[in-house]
Amino acid sequence: MSVVTTREIANALNLDETEVQQQAMMAWLTEQKRRILQTRLEILARYRSASLEELEAKIADGEAPEHPAWEDLIVAENLSNRLEEINAYLRRLQSAG
C-alpha cells in the first residue's frame, strides 16, 4: 500500500501544495468541531439544559443530581475550551487562505 502525499494530490489536481494542506487542515478541524459540538449538545440534552450556565444553575439548585452532573459539566467546559482553540486555528487558516 502506497502513501498518498499532499504533493501528489496537488500535482494531480494542478493546485498549490500549501493550499491543499490548508484545506485538509480546515476540513479536519471542522470535523473535530462538529464532533465536539455534538458531544457537548448530548451532555446538555441529558439535563435538558440549553447552556453550560443553565446546567450549572440546575446543579446548584438541586434540579440536576450533583453526580454525575458536575463531572459532565467539567467535560462540557473542557469541550468548550477545545472548541475555542479549534475556532482560533480555523480563523488563522481562513485569513491565511
Language model regions located:
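Solvent-exposed interaction patches of small proteins and small membrane subunits
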Residues: 46-49, 92, 97
